[in-house]
UniProtKB/Swiss-Prot annotation:
It is found in: Cell membrane. It comes from Streptococcus mutans serotype c (strain ATCC 700610 / UA159). Keywords: ATP synthesis, Cell membrane, CF(0), Hydrogen ion transport, Ion transport, Membrane, Transmembrane, Transmembrane helix, Transport. Its main location: membrane. InterPro entries: ATP_synth_B-like_membr_sf (IPR028987), ATP_synth_b/b'su_bac/chlpt (IPR002146), ATP_synth_F0_bsu_bac (IPR005864), ATP_synthase_B_chain (IPR050059). F(1)F(0) ATP synthase produces ATP from ADP in the presence of a proton or sodium gradient. F-type ATPases consist of two structural domains, F(1) containing the extramembraneous catalytic core and F(0) containing the membrane proton channel, linked together by a central stalk and a peripheral stalk. During catalysis, ATP synthesis in the catalytic domain of F(1) is coupled via a rotary mechanism of the central stalk subunits to proton translocation. One of its GO terms (molecular function) is proton-transporting ATP synthase activity, rotational mechanism. It is a single-pass membrane protein. The gene is atpF. This is ATP synthase subunit b.
Amino acid sequence: MSTLINGTSLGNLLIVTGSFILLLLLVKKFAWSQLAAIFKAREEKIAKDIDDAENSRQNAQVLENKRQVELNQAKDEAAQIIDNAKETGKAQESKIITEAHEEAGRLKDKANQDIATSKAEALSSVKADVADLSVLLAEKIMAKNLDKTAQGDLIDSYLDKLGDA
């Protein structure tokens, strides 16, 4: 009985081994090329995806660098615009101050001329009034033949009138 078991086991082993080898030969003949093609296609797809991802990363890096350069240029341009505006403002400030000083000088000169004209007119008017009063005083003195005290009082009276005028 033990030879039967050993013989059966050996027979089973030979049948299973033969079946396995036959299966491998059939798979190699009919399916191996298709399986290899599937694995090759999968490998190529994964490699392509990795390359695409690397290219996308590089493009993103280039784009980021370009955006950073543009941002820096925009900042520099904004700073330049601000500096130009400050310079323009200072120039306008200086111009306005200069014009204001010139206008103040013109107004001062005109006021001085007006004052001089008014003074000249006032002096002319006073001279005319003094001349008229002097003539009037002389006429009264001649007409009245006054003593020295009366003449002094009369002159003081006319001078007071002149001071009021």
